[in-house]
């Protein structure tokens, strides 16, 4: 019997109105821009409660059900806990400053934003956050879910480096921080893990110079049995 290719989604979904946080990009679009320092500062001040946890689980369950109803084989939790799919990871790693934002032009000039700054060496000194997020969402899914994480190059392009000034070394440290989460996910039972690196398609020279090494570092010593995904996006204009 022939079977089709398994289907999945990139990861994020619009946040339900009942959630206690807003999406970084949605907040920015309210002003017709792509920058929302208010959303960053609001999330920094946010302190989740037990009632909020129930809402995040409810949102994950609703979004997973939508995907399964649409025929998706490997759903995600919609990244419902994240105010920004990149910055959420950074908040769990030391070295990032979310109090004093830096203005930067990013995505090859596509837009400007006030971004968290790297002011010290990147160190993953706290317990991994991903096992909790994964197990809470997996508990309300009848199918194995996929967990998504930002890749080193994508993190680098959405933060302000005020410390390293060395892309290769920064990518290596960021890759190590993602690797710790991935290995913890596998230990928690996650078998579908995606690293988002849309910047590979925009910055080919950097992708070949150090991006591939950073991505490989993300999956270093990850036990066999886990299915790894890499999310790439094509730029608006392709020059051939």
What are these regions (language model features)?
Residues 1-232:
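Domain-level signal for soluble alpha/beta catalytic cores
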Residues 231, 236-240:
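Single conserved hydrophobic/aromatic residue that forms the stacking wall/gate
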């Amino acid at each position: 019997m022939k079977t089709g290719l398994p289907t999945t989604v990139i990861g994020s979904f619009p946040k339900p109105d009942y959630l206690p946080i807003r999406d970084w990009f949605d907040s920015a679009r309210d002003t017709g821009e792509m920058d929302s320092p208010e959303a960053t500062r609001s999330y920094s001040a946010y302190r989740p409660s037990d009632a909020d946890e129930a809402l995040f689980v409810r949102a994950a369950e609703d979004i997973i059900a939508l995907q399964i109803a649409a025929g998706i084989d490997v759903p995600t939790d919609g990244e419902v806990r994240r105010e920004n799919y990149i910055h959420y990871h950074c908040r769990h790693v030391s070295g990032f400053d979310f109090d004093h934002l830096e203005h930067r032009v990013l995505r090859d000039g596509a837009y400007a934003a006030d971004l968290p700054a790297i002011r010290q060496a990147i160190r993953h000194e706290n317990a991994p956050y991903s096992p909790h997020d994964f197990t809470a969402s997996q508990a309300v899914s009848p199918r194995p879910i996929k967990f998504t994480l930002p890749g080193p190059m994508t993190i680098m392009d959405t933060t302000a480096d005020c410390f390293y000034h060395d892309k290769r070394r920064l990518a290596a440290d960021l890759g190590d921080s993602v690797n710790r989460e991935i290995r913890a996910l596998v230990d928690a039972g996650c078998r579908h893990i995606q690293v988002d690196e849309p910047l590979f398609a925009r910055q080919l020279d950097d992708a070949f110079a150090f991006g591939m090494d950073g991505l490989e570092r993300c999956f270093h010593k990850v036990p066999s049995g886990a299915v790894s995904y890499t999310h790439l996006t094509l730029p608006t204009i392709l020059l051939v």
